[in-house]
Amino acid sequence: DGQTFIPMPLVVSAVHHHLIVKKLRSKASIVCISGNCIEDHHFAVLIALGASGIYPIGSYKTIQKYHPESDFYISLDNYRHSVEKGLLKIMSKMGISTLTSYHGSMLLHAIGLGERLSKEYFPSIPSLIGGIELEDIEKTLKERIRLQVGNNNSWSLKENGLFRYRKSGEAHGYSPTVFKKIQYLGTSGKKPNNKVNDDRPIYIRDLLCYKTSRPILNLEAIEDSSSILKRFGSGGISFGAISEKSHRELAKGFSLVGARSNTGEGGEKSDRYSISNDDISVNSYVKQIASGRFGVNSEYLAAANEIQIKIAQGAKPGEGGQLPGFKVSSMIAATRSSSPGIPLISPPPHHDIYSIEDIKQLIYDLKDVNPRAKVSVKLVSQPGVGIVASGVVKAGANIILISGADGGTGASPLGSQKHTGFPWEYGLAETHQTLYANGLREYVTLRVDGGIKRAEDIIFAAILGAEEFDFGTSALIALGCVMARQCHLNTCPVGIATTDEKVEKRFKGKAENVSRYLESISESVRNELSKIGKTSLHDIIGRTDLLKINKKQENLVKNKKIDLKAVSYTHLRAHETDY
């Protein structure tokens, strides 16, 4: 009959706010009967929008269909328990311990919702790059039903590959095609015949392109590869999350080309420190300090060229970290000053940092221990990060790292992988613009990480304000990672994300795989610079006037009503980029 259902979040939020306006909200509960409320994220959204109770009829019917009557109540209890654990995890990210406090809190962000839709139905939830309106949602839902039912009324559902990659499903940033190309770069050093990335847009930067010049500059006029490589670094990947051997090879791979290696939050074996080891290539350039303070002592800090304070992780902000007990071997325990077999948890907050004054004190103390080391602070890309970054610069940080949601660990919960964090494009642009507006930009180096794997990513990040660039997942892929996403199980098929000595024997990666990958990216960056008509990365930092909408994506941007002004806002004249 041409009608369709109304999405439950839309209904709940509309009713919730209407009752508030009429001063009737406290007199009634809102109970949802929903067929598409399945994951913990779905429950969290409905509760945050005002739902008092949820009956996930679709989930219950599915459990009933696939489990015999004798197991139904056990399976139902397991499902409810997993949803409850997920909700507790989500609430804890905001420091909330009771469901009553989370109820109607509107503690959400939106990406891709139009301004009219947000103001009318989701007030107080910012939607930062524009997007679809009510009529677009209706059109999409009707089209889905038409495609699903077809002419034969078949209701069999296709797997859309939301979590596990499927060739005909949702596009993934690290699809098998992509990681095979990265590994090809790591083994051969030669660029594959086709691009590293999928043609389908996945990131905000895929909607943009940069202006090119005619004629293209000769490569001899472009800064050499070694200068570009000095701007590269490793993401913080801890010893414990990955094996000791792969951690060494990763550090060595970055050191071989003059790039920065990073310990991650798990400390480092003292035999790798440059003060006690002639082979300084395995001494991580950056020593990270996280909330758990694992492996942190004066010797560790003294061996650092840079000390990084990790406030949060872009892939799972507000979550902290956890190393399961079965991954805590005697070697890990010794390095982290712990006991074998005991789970190690980094809490979401630093319990000695509750203000800018606290972080200023920590920076002062770290510089007191190691005066020659620079101090960087890792912040998460999100709305408002620019103001926080300004305070951190005033507190004495030398480097600000903006971490995006698109990188991160294969051990992250599935809900965090899909529904937590912000693209680095937004946080980086806001931070650069805020620092510039407050006269602080010249006092700090801006760095970025989170899903960086191509030369084009480097160019876009530089245009949005970054001077340095960190590779995490892509560097591990060059080392041999096959994206099995079982890092937390200690059963890595290629012996990287494991502390089991038997499993570690599968590891075949070499430092040269990483160095070749980085060298290939740096050469590709030189090629891109020649197309733009600039001789160095320095010349394009903050030059958002070089951006324009990608012609291939013009229809998508128009149809989805996407507004990229927040990302590509230009406040600099061509001669004002001297950082």
Go through each PLM region and give its residues.
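Polar, glycine-rich mid-to-C-terminal structural blocks
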Residues: 108-140
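Glycine-rich phosphate/ribose-binding loops and adjacent secondary-structure elements
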Residues: 1-85, 90-99, 109, 114, ...
